[in-house]
Amino acid sequence: AFSDAGDARAGSITYNHGQDAMIFKTVGQNERLRIASDGNIEASGNLKTNNLSGRNRITNGDMRVSQRYGTTETTINVNAWHYILDRFKMYQNTDGQATVTQVTSGYAASNTGSGNALRIKVTSADTSLSGTQQLQLTQVIEGFNCEDLRFGTANAKSFTVSFSILATGASAGNVTGTYCVNATNFGNYDRAYVKEYTIDAIDVWKKVTLTFPGCTNGTWGTGNTGGIRLGWFFAGPTSQQGAANQWHTSYKGSTTNQKNGMGVVNNFYFIKDIQVEEGTIATSFEHRSYGEELARCQRYYEEAMISGQSYIGGANHVGIPAKYAVTKRAAATVSWTLDASGNMNGTSPNAIHRNRIDGAYAYQSAAGNGNYYYYYIYKADAEL
């Protein structure tokens, strides 16, 4: 047995010959770890480590997947949610403007963390925000992926958000300051918790760690609906401000300390390695293979080309099937674009005849008898 000097509490490490096991005990001689003769290890508590899989509730946190725009710089739609990189959408309703892109070089290629990042660039400034004006990056975590946190019950669990961020601009004062991240119940938005963090210097990656306590009340989505929505504010809504570090019973986006990142043209923000995990400890970022990350993203959005050929006798229709690579979260909104190399009529199918979570079936009119071939690009959107 052993204890600290002046502390009566003791722990012990013993070898039990009868059971042929090494036993580790802590305060009060409670058994915590046992190594049996067959090599099996039994622990009485949870194993906490930096390399177990399945920790991260965020999809595409390392910003590798960008099905919609690739690395093309894209202006954020005003007054509308706009998906850029997979699973991440942005909202911008200020009097200024900003662009977003996936970057794989420069700051993103530093020796800190992943080699990709999401970059926000202010292209037109708004120096005085009012009402709900904001610039926000968001991901909605599907209920299946967060319902085990038991939000809305007495057993609600804490979760920890970690990410790496870098800001730069014409001068440090343009971007340094206090920023906010909020958590809210998707769809209802009547529970919200705000956390603050600071950007202290420009041109330096900073890892931020924020712990959110479990919310024991309110309605939180489960199953394939939206559960927890997380928002990163680069400019915050003045009419939706609230105190940090407490659960609110109405929607709050940021605190009164929130920096207006839209205030100066050519402010840049880079963010990557976003992770959300159960508990109060931020472990190292969980890297998944590109194929696995892409498949996770395709549950919510997928685009691909389909082609085929069919003989039509008379003015009839050609059936066009789209079999998804990954089963969708829900029946998707599907758009189709006819490739110019085909010989079908029109630029998109006449109608979608079947729409399921595993695929869709449309038909396209033909001009008359003959062989018809088609090349279609479809986009299936089942985002939250």
Predicted regions and their residues:
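Short, mixed charged/polar active-site loops
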Residues: A8-A10, N30-R32, D190-A192, W205
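Extracellular and organelle-lumenal recognition/adhesion modules and their flexible linkers in secreted
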Residues: N40-L384
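Low-complexity, small-hydrophobic/phenylalanine-enriched stretches
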Residues: A1, I13, M22-F24, G28, ...
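Self-maturation zones of extracellular/virion spikes and adhesins
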Residues: A1-Q29, T94, V100-S105
